[in-house]
């Protein structure tokens, strides 16, 4: 039986008090609805239809991935009405899985189990709460079979005492869905077409109704306000932190590490507090990440140390290199084995060769630095003339003195030495000493100006 997934993402989310559609608010740096789409793809459905409404152009522009189908819900008339908008993409012999764009953390494992028990039946994902107030109740008969779902505003006092609630996630044979949706009525307290009313129609039709529950409560928790958004962020980060620790990483405080993408760790990795990882990041064995670091789309090899408050983006760092504290590696930076980038150093689109050092207060951009090079404090590669970028080539075993400006394009040959305070505008050959600075003058009898 083919699988069709419908994701409901049309709501405005007025309680968010935001110009942004609710489903475009983020957990772990990713829009809520993108989490749902990514999970849906792991189920390998025939198609995924996203039902959009409020600011649909923002939703369509803000999610990624090929092959999404879109259905417009011009008026928000309830969940049953929303699902009906996506029916044109569903084949009658398939099964429809209904998901919600503001319920981001449902796992693929939970959904696979749910689909397995729902084949050919009406499946309802439920959960049991100590305080079910506000949710639709699962009403069962004396035999324990589900006979209806009653929304909070329509429930009797006896029904309000039921603590098994509907999560909203359903699996339905498409042919039955097309049969039941036109029969829905909006004669209820909300004046809406409830998708949950198909349960009573299933009972009338003699269709079996089955239920399943998720492994964790946060898998079915939705977002209606920013407090709930923050709670799901913490739940997600706690889950990721536990996975990292089980994979061999030590987190100094699991509550103070944020992963906003995919983080792969080797053995005996150490991550200090307030580290943020974004995009795709790989940490090799025995990598040490200091406090307050931001690492985005980086590959960091074994035995690398990243000191406190360093920022690394789209960079590669080879084994035994060290970075920071307070260093910045921008896109295109590559530190080779045992290279060192120290405090208040910025590297952009540059290779720093094996064993080379840029220890303090320097900028190296659009450059290739060979092996065993020492770049003194305050060195700048002047790579931009206001219109174009130019490259600096520093070959092996070069020594660059402090407070030096290297005006690109320029090449420093192997073993060259640059005197401190130089502004180098011409190539320096192998093993040459270059000194390019004004001659010092000492003036006797100098009197400092005084304030008038």
Curated annotation (Swiss-Prot):
How does the cofactor attach, per the note? Binds 1 Mg(2+) ion per subunit.
A Pfam match is NTP_transf_3
| Annotated binding of UDP-N-acetyl-alpha-D-glucosamine, by residue | 8-11, 22, 73, 78-79, 100-102, 136, 151, 166, 224, 330, 348, 363, 374
Q: Which UniProt keywords apply?
A: Acyltransferase, Cell shape, Cell wall biogenesis/degradation, Cytoplasm, Magnesium, Metal-binding, Multifunctional enzyme, Nucleotidyltransferase, Peptidoglycan synthesis, Repeat, Transferase
Cellular component, GO annotation: cytoplasm; membrane
Q: What are the names of the required cofactors?
A: Mg(2+)
Q: Chief localization class?
A: cytoplasm
Entry EC no(s): 2.7.7.23, 2.3.1.157
Q: Which InterPro entries match?
A: Bifunctional_GlmU, GlmU-like, GlmU_C_LbH, Hexapep, Hexapep_transf_CS, MobA-like_NTP_Trfase, Nucleotide-diphossugar_trans, Trimer_LpxA-like_sf
Q: Any idea which positions bind acetyl-CoA?
A: 377, 383-384, 402, 420, 437
Q: Where is this region: Linker?
A: 227-247
Named in its record, the pathway it takes part in is: Nucleotide-sugar biosynthesis; UDP-N-acetyl-alpha-D-glucosamine biosynthesis; N-acetyl-alpha-D-glucosamine 1-phosphate from alpha-D-glucosamine 6-phosphate (route II): step 2/2; Nucleotide-sugar biosynthesis; UDP-N-acetyl-alpha-D-glucosamine biosynthesis; UDP-N-acetyl-alpha-D-glucosamine from N-acetyl-alpha-D-glucosamine 1-phosphate: step 1/1; Bacterial outer membrane biogenesis; LPS lipid A biosynthesis
HAMAP family tied to this protein: GlmU
Q: What is this protein called?
A: Bifunctional protein GlmU
Q: Which organism is it from?
A: Hahella chejuensis (strain KCTC 2396)
Identify the coding gene: glmU
């Amino acid at each position: 039986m083919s699988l069709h997934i419908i994701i409901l993402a049309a709501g405005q989310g007025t309680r968010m008090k935001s110009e942004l559609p609710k489903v475009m608010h983020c957990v772990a740096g990713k829009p809520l609805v993108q989490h749902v789409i990514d999970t849906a793809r792991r189920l390998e459905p025939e198609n995924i239809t996203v039902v959009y409404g409020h600011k649909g152009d923002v939703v369509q522009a803000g999610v990624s991935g090929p092959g999404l189908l879109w259905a417009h819900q011009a008026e928000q008339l309830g969940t049953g009405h929303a699902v009906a908008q996506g029916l044109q993409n569903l084949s009658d012999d398939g099964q429809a899985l209904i998901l919600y764009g503001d319920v981001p953390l449902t796992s693929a494992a939970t959904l696979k189990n749910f689909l397995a028990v729902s084949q050919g039946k009406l499946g309802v994902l439920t959960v049991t709460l100590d305080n079910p107030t506000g949710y639709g109740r699962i009403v069962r008969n004396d035999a324990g079979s589900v006979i209806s779902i009653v929304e909070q505003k329509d429930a009797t006092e006896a029904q309000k005492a039921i603590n098994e609630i509907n999560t909203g996630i359903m699996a339905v044979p498409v042919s039955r869905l097309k049969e039941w949706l036109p029969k829905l009525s909006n004669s209820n307290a909300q004046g809406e077409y409830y998708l949950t009313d198909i349960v009573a129609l299933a009972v009338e039709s003699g269709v079996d109704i089955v239920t399943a529950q998720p492994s964790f409560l946060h898998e079915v928790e939705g977002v209606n306000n920013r407090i709930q958004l923050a709670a799901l962020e913490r739940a997600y980060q706690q889950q990721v932190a536990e996975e990292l620790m089980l994979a061999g990483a030590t987190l100094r405080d699991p509550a103070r590490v944020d992963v906003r993408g995919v983080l792969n760790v080797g053995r005996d990795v150490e991550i200090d507090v307030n580290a943020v990882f974004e995009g795709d990041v790989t940490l090799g064995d025995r990598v040490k990440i200091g406090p307050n670091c931001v690492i985005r789309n980086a590959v960091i090899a074994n035995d690398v140390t990243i000191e406190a408050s360093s920022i690394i983006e789209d960079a590669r760092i080879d084994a035994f290199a060290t970075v920071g504290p307070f260093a910045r590696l921008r896109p295109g930076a590559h530190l080779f084995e045992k290279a060192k980038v120290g405090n208040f150093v910025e590297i952009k689109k540059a290779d720093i060769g094996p064993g080379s050092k840029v220890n303090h207060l320097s900028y190296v951009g659009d450059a290739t630095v060979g092996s065993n090079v020492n770049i003194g404090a305050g060195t700048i590669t002047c790579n931009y003339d206001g219109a174009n970028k130019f490259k600096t080539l520093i070959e092996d075993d070069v020594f660059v003195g402090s407070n030096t400006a290297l005006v690109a394009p320029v090449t420093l040959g192997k073993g060259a030495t640059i005197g401190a305070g130089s502004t180098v505008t011409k190539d320096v050959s192998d093993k040459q000493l270059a000194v390019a600075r004004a001659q010092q003058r000492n003036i006797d009898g100098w009197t400092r100006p005084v304030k008038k």
